[in-house]
Design a protein with these regions (language model features):
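Short acidic, glycine/serine/threonine-rich loops at helix termini
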Residues: 11-14, 46-51, 121-126, 168-170, ...
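Active-site glycine-rich loop that binds ribose-phosphate moieties when present
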Residues: 13-25, 90-93
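A generic local secondary-structure boundary/capping motif
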Residues: 21-32, 44-48, 95-101, 143-148, ...
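Internal metal/ion-chelating core segments
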Residues: 31-120
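Structural motif
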Residues: 36-38, 154-159, 199
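Membrane-embedded hairpin module used as a gating/binding unit in multi-pass transport
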Residues: 82-167
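C-terminal catalytic subdomain
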Residues: 169-171, 175-219
Length: 219
């Protein structure tokens, strides 16, 4: 989140969504003549694709709003799978973003770049977040899932990088490593045999990047 969550002079309480989520947002954005969200559309290990209403639901909201979706009762649901556009978590992003639009009296103008495996821009979409999201997902879906493959495989060899997504140390932290692998299982499930095995190449040197995640060793 990019807001100071204790600076209540610069936060606006927008009440609750129809689903009961408390929405509090950044007052600078609320008061702006034009509200612009700039980011990317890329498959996340959780919560579906990045971009769209996910920007505002996590980036300019309050911890009370974030606690409606980044919690076990949402992230441990059966519909909680990586790179999904239809889950409770994704729906909460949309609901909170639309609540912000309703109370601001204006729509978010969203500009998202669809990224490839090396985070290069392969397509850019701009417009109202509600209409732009599904358009960007079409190309992101082609990049993320292996639509062209037909054969099923017994073995998948995967190189686990040390530095990805949130920062250095993710590929050597066992919790985040398992999360990254689960995302690959979802991506490739269609071409995996019933007894498929992942062979993962990783440094496995115990590096947790304690400066960034001081709590993960205990966790």
């Amino acid at each position: 989140c990019s807001s100071d969550l204790e600076d209540y002079d610069h936060l606006v309480d927008l009440g609750h969504t129809a689903q009961g989520d408390h929405v509090i947002m950044n007052k600078y954005v609320y008061d702006a003549d034009v509200a612009v969200l700039i980011g990317h559309t890329q498959g996340n290990p959780y919560g579906g694709y990045s971009g769209g209403y996910k920007h505002c639901a996590t980036g300019i909201s309050h911890w009370r709003s974030i606690s409606a979706h980044h919690v076990p009762q949402v992230m441990h649901r059966q519909d909680f799978v990586p790179v999904s556009t239809n889950s409770e978590m994704r729906h909460k992003f949309d609901q909170q973003g639309m609540r912000m639009e309703e109370k601001m009296g204006k729509k978010f103008f969203c500009c998202d770049a669809v990224l490839d495996t090396k985070s290069r821009q392969i397509e850019i979409h701009s417009g109202w977040a509600r209409e732009m999201q599904p358009v960007s997902w079409k190309t992101a879906d082609k990049r993320t899932y292996v639509h062209w493959a037909e054969k099923k495989y017994d073995i998948i060899v995967f190189g686990m990088p040390t530095n990805f997504h949130y920062g250095n140390g993710m590929g050597t932290n066992p919790i985040q490593m398992m999360q990254a692998l689960s995302a690959q299982v979802i991506r490739h499930r269609r071409i995996m045999s019933d007894h498929c095995v992942f062979i993962v190449s990783s440094i496995c040197d115990g590096y947790f990047h304690d400066e960034r995640w001081p709590y993960l060793r205990e966790l």
